[in-house]
Amino acid sequence: LVCFGDSITAQDWPDYLTLRCAREGFNNVSIIRRAVSGTRILREYSCITYAAYGLKGATRFPIEMNVAGARSVIVQHGINDIIHPVGVEVNKFRPWSDMPTADDLINGVRSLYVTHARKLSLKIYSGTLLPIYGWRTYNENRDIIRMAFNEWLRTAPEFDGCVDFDKAVRGHDDPKRFANNFDSGDHLHPSAKAYEAMAESVPEELLK
């Protein structure tokens, strides 16, 4: 089972998923992480300042899905496409023209990830994007894009299923925010407790 994404996947939920597999006796699955912090679906940076953010998803995905024995992939990707653009007057490398619509993200995932996963005979599961309320570039428009994209991720027939990470970590009274004790403090990345909840939200069918 390949876990594909950005900094959220580069951190702890795949580790907690591995621990869960050991604890619950899912002994016929390996959890493989393929994650790069800062990476986006649709674009990559051409400047050395953000070189560590790596390649865009269109380039990464075909390379990183070459995993011997892989049967399924969970894709949790796209939040950086939404939160990075701030305008050239703030950061010359992050123009507003980089801001995607929800349809841009949907078409990107459909054409770049779903299509290639099918070529490799992989089952592909969507992972919803987590709350961002309070993040330093948060605004209502960004959250509207996130929520519209999430709704598609939950319902799109192109996927074999959805891992609703957003539902696992969001607040019950205010779903735009992390639940209590689930925010690492920057309002973007989850706490250790939240990463554990994300791992617990992965359906058993992916682990058998």
Label every model-predicted segment.
Residues 129-208:
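Catalytic His-Asp segment of secreted/periplasmic serine-dependent ester chemistry enzymes
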Residues 1-108, 135-138, 189:
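Conserved SGNH/GDSL esterase-like catalytic core that processes O-acyl groups on lipids
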Residues 61-64, 68-71, 109-116, 160-168:
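Phosphate-binding glycine-rich loops and adjacent basic patches that engage nucleotide phosphates
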Residues 30, 121-123, 161:
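Proline-centered loop/turn at the N-terminus of a beta-strand
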Residues 76-81, 112-147:
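Active-site segments of SGNH/GDSL-like serine hydrolases
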Residues 32-34, 127, 165:
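Short glycine/serine/threonine-enriched helix-capping/active-site loop
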Residues 15, 19, 59, 63, ...:
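Solvent-exposed, polar/charged alpha-helical surfaces in well-ordered, non-transmembrane soluble domains
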Residues 9, 18, 22-23, 66, ...:
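Sec-exported extracytoplasmic/periplasmic mature domains
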